[in-house]
């Protein structure tokens, strides 16, 4: 992870799995310490959208995102459905420079 966020050619990192509550689920704790800024709205929006798909089970997701060295990092649940939801309904548009009114692209190339 440290190599990726140090690489000027990598602007986005997607991590899947480890966002639940079992003893093996430590992705948010391991990755969030690297964040310069957390994208609080990502987890909130992901759970809101997921609620429409899986109901209250979404409360078990600890999906997080943040910026580390001008790289945006998304920590997603391990299920393919959750990854698809995050990509199609949140991440893809935020990585599109033409998406309005705002997107993440300018934050990825400022350094």
Residue positions per predicted region:
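Non-catalytic beta/alpha edge segments that cap or flank active sites
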Residues: 1-111
